[in-house]
Regions:
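Canonical alpha-helical transmembrane segments of integral membrane proteins
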Residues: 12-24, 78-83, 109-112
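Hydrophobic alpha-helical transmembrane segments
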Residues: 47-54, 71-100
Length: 178
């Protein structure tokens, strides 16, 4: 049972990178619609109607608002704290608490994925062009499903490893008694 928890180090490093990028994204200001319009004017693509450009601007602005909401900021900060706490537990070789803390992080990430999905569906409703709305809706669903599946796989891996550790510990105790 003295194996090193490499799986948890890998998961925590990936989670730390995600948390850091989320924290940096949160620190940036919400762009104004005028800034988005000027950026869209510079990237004007042939065959794109004015309504599609306006839909894209409204969608982008709403997504930026959602990503800077108090609930989302609280999720990001709490996630970063949980990752740091799990790393501290792992450094101190308290694997059980590190696992529990990481499970909390993953559950929080799943809540964040659900919140992001609901927010993106709200933003999609601002799009008037039916083709664009359908494309954005499918894209947001695919991203949300992907993130949820990844988080569930991480959760399953941690639960499996915790089960194996408990089983090995029980076998060691049985051998000591015998």
């Amino acid at each position: 049972m003295k194996k090193k928890p490499i799986y948890l180090w890998v998961l925590l490093i990936l989670s730390a990178l995600i948390s850091v990028s989320s924290l940096f994204g949160m620190l940036g200001p919400i762009p104004s619609k005028e800034v988005l319009r000027s950026a869209a004017a510079q990237k004007q693509v042939a065959g794109v109607s004015a309504q599609q450009v306006e839909d894209s601007i409204n969608y982008s602005y709403r997504v930026a608002e959602i990503s800077h909401s108090i609930f989302n900021v609280a999720l990001i900060v709490l996630s970063a704290i949980l990752v740091v706490v799990a790393i501290v537990f792992l450094i101190r070789k308290n694997l059980q608490y590190a696992n529990y803390t990481y499970v909390g992080y993953v559950l929080l990430a799943i809540i964040g994925s659900i919140y992001g999905y609901v927010g993106l569906q709200d933003a999609v409703q601002l799009v008037q062009d039916e083709t664009m709305r359908l494309t954005m809706s499918i894209g947001s669903k695919a991203v949300s499903i992907f993130y949820s599946v990844i988080n569930i796989l991480f959760l399953a891996l941690v639960f499996y490893k915790m089960w194996r550790q408990q089983k090995a510990l029980a076998e060691e105790e049985t051998e000591e008694v015998a």
